[in-house]
């Protein structure tokens, strides 16, 4: 039977696809890195994804972020991304959380419930705290080491 993930299944196999479809992932950051990661997960057939970002789409995001268009300016990035994911993979459960992850807000998250954590945060303090917390819980974390807001890469 052909379905939206039949080609993925041909590449990785039925068991691996079912594992992806049962997975629960959280992504922190819905910007230039996180947006692409979230969309790739949806196109791979992820079962459940929580997306976290307190920011809204701005005009300056249009050159590099999937969700940024004139029509989405001033909307929460997580809400725009949730709508986009539902057009790609309607069976994916998406929880949109417009929260700024910081050491002070981390108690709002039970990170132990996730199969994987993706860190696409551009705040160094938050990034370090998230990595340390994930490691202490034994939850695998994939961390993007971008240089958001840096203009001279030799100083990163």
What are these regions (language model features)?
Residues 71, 92-101:
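Conserved SAM-binding strand-loop segment of SAM-dependent methyltransferases
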Residues 41:
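Aromatic pocket-lining residues of Rossmann-like dinucleotide-binding sites
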Residues 33-34:
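Hydrophobic/small residue at the entry helix of a nucleotide-binding pocket
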Residues 27-29, 52:
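Conserved N-terminal Rossmann-fold NAD(P)-binding element of oxidoreductases
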Residues 116-156:
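E1/E1-like adenylate-forming module used to activate ubiquitin-like modifiers
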Residues 1-26:
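N-terminal charged helix/coil linker that caps or initiates catalytic domains
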